[in-house]
């Protein structure tokens, strides 16, 4: 196990959980709330998945690979949805989600497991 890769993944997951929570809250306060309902739900789900991933890594869960894969997929879906909206918080969240997905995938790349 490459501890540096896991450390970066945890950092990205924490950042992503915070950004997704902030984005969901900001979306709730927008005028076009109906157009943002899917974004809000995906933000909440992504934040929850990122928190689960951090706990799994910290606890050395035997399913880390599967959990990281699901987290990466969740981040991709959230990033895609956020990118559809013009709001700065959505665009920022999309970028953070993409970075998190990349770190989740990198942590389980064959070279990362030593």
What are these regions (language model features)?
Residues 1-114:
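Amphipathic alpha-helical hairpins
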